[in-house]
């Protein structure tokens, strides 16, 4: 049943994406994280050790609770009727994927860039990146959008797809809980240096294998879409560690190589300047059309991952 749920979820995401009117599990995960963080901080000592333990408790409770709750709902639905169980799994699998939403948001940036309306492009890209965007040039906006497509191809598409192929919607949503937790508390700043450490480490572990699979699939997608697959492979091998996270540069490096552009580098986050290494070679200047090229490669690698997964499941 899992294979059919994954296939159905993939189709649902490709057609509908994430409609704004439809409640999304990630929203409730975010609310749960905020409540748990507030409660843990209030009850534990305000010391590095106390914050470490608070973060560990959060990193245990949220994924375990997510898996338990979603498993109970799926089993309950299947007990009422197998088709209802399949429908619930299919619906949640679709919500765990973010391919359509990623393309929609990145294309919003693309459309503003080609008008050209730089202030509107900055606003559009600010919805999908964490860096400060107020002073970005058109090149900086384009680079930010391409980087986001490449990175989220892993943690927004390939990783949840892999986990749902292994354990259905419950495991995919558990992964989303880990990823959401990291995005909310996994910062190395004063507020979360200790409290967010366990969440960040758990996210690194959960993404370790998927990010590398995603990078290899990106190289294959580069070949299938007429981009530079040889350069994608070479730059991935060279620059895949050019990031503080062991996973974030995996698909970014493959994407930079495929497009023959340079990504990453210094950026401002929350008003603070961060000096980060570059990824890829500036063989040519980056251009708005690279956003569309990245989107196409992301979709092709998603289809490759789906096909391989369904073959392993015996569906194809």
Regions found by a protein language model. Give the residues of each.
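Hydrophobic alpha-helical transmembrane segments
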Residues: 1-174, 178, 186-316
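Glycine-rich phosphate/dinucleotide-binding loop and adjoining beta-alpha-beta core of small-molecule
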Residues: 183
């Amino acid at each position: 049943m899992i294979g059919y749920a994954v296939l159905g979820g993939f189709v649902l995401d490709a057609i509908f994406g994430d409609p704004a009117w439809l409640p999304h599990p990630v929203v409730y995960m975010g609310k749960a994280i905020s409540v748990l963080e507030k409660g843990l901080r209030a009850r534990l000592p305000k010391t590095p050790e106390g914050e470490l333990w608070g973060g560990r408790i959060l990193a245990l409770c949220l994924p375990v609770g997510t898996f338990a709750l979603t498993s109970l709902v799926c089993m309950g639905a299947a007990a009422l009727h197998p088709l209802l169980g399949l429908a619930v799994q299919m619906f949640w699998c679709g919500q765990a994927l973010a391919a359509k939403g990623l393309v929609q948001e990145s294309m919003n940036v693309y459309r503003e860039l080609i008008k050209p309306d730089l202030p509107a492009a900055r606003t559009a890209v600010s919805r999908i990146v964490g860096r400060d965007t107020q002073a970005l040039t058109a090149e900086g906006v384009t680079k930010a959008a391409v980087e986001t497509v490449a990175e989220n191809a892993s943690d927004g598409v390939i990783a949840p797809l892999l986990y749902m192929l292994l354990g259905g919607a419950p495991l995919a949503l558990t992964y989303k809980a880990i990823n959401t937790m990291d995005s909310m508390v996994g910062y190395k700043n004063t507020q979360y240096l200790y409290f967010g450490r366990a969440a960040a480490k758990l996210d690194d572990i959960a993404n370790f294998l998927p990010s590398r699979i995603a990078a290899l699939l990106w190289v294959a997608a580069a070949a299938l879409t007429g981009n530079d697959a040889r350069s994608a492979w070479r730059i991935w091998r060279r620059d895949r560690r050019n990031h503080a996270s062991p996973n974030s540069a995996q698909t970014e490096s493959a994407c930079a190589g495929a497009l023959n552009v340079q990504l990453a580098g210094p950026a401002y986050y929350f008003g603070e300047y961060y000096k980060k290494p570059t990824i890829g070679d500036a063989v040519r200047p980056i251009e708005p059309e690279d956003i569309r090229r990245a989107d196409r490669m992301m979709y092709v690698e998603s289809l490759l991952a789906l096909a391989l997964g369904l073959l392993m499941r015996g569906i194809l």
